[in-house]
Amino acid sequence: AKTVLVYGHYDVMPVDPLDEWTTEPFEPVVRDGRIWGRGADDDKGQSFMHIKAFEAMCATGQLPCNVKFMLEGEEEIGSQSLYKFCREQKRLLKSDVILVSDTSMISMDTPSITCGLRGLTYMQVEVTGPEKDLHSGLFGGAVANPANVLARLVASLVDDEGRVTIPGFYDDVRELSAAERRALNKAPFRLADYKRSLHIGDVAGEAGYTTMERTGVRPSLDVNGIWGGYIEEGTKTIIPARASAKISMRLVPNQDFRKIAKLFERYFRAIAPRSVKVDVRFLHGGAPYV
């Protein structure tokens, strides 16, 4: 009999900001027919679904194959131990099919088979100016403000057409054929429902591509977090000494996450003004797969 290996993960993204939760994140509740709690969607819920499906097929004598489960606890931080584990446990993990229990559906009523996932390059940048915070009344307009500089640098990474501006970023991207694009856009995706579910007025992204193409087969760049200066209640008129951001780039076949990290660092340093110092760090990455 064939063997299926089911991969999933039980670790989750951080729960902050806590004040936006209506229930405790790690105390799941059923509301409106749905389970609410951290990991209900990514990825405890999906893994549980496959485990229960396996259990039901065993109970009814309908299991047509062997099944193995591999659930890890480091997916959200780049699966740092997974590569070593897979190399050391090749015999244990040997299978004919790998089922990734960590994907999505086009809609609530449309079963979907995901046959590819974009890759990732995840970076952190820090822009530093003066050695300490300065008073904006005394130094504003004369000293580079790291927060202002960072905002300009980050904004320049994607142009008005939604394209990443890093030189060489698209060099290895495999372009889809007209037939592949037609096949992709035959999927029962409803843009109006998509916008409604996200509570947005309109979509955005790379010009010339549909939302399905933008999220599935085109690379992208996003700021995941940005911080610096005074953000508490009240006022504090400073020029912050430093400002930082976390930036992720989603990659498509033929793009190498290590190469993209080097291109990003080289470009970010090149566009930074001499009035500030820049630190660029690669956090983690993963290869795209189709």
What are these regions (language model features)?
Residues 112-128:
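Flexible glycine/proline-rich, aromatic-decorated loop/lid segments
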Residues 36-37, 131-137, 232-233:
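Short small-residue beta-strand/loop micro-motif enriched in glycine and branched aliphatics
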Residues 111-115, 232-237:
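Short beta-strand/turn micro-motifs at beta-sheet edges
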Residues 106, 115, 122, 136-226, ...:
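Acidic-enriched catalytic cores of C-N bond-cleaving enzymes acting on peptides and small amides
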Residues 1-38, 57-63, 247:
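Acidic/His- and Gly-rich active-site-bordering loop/insert found
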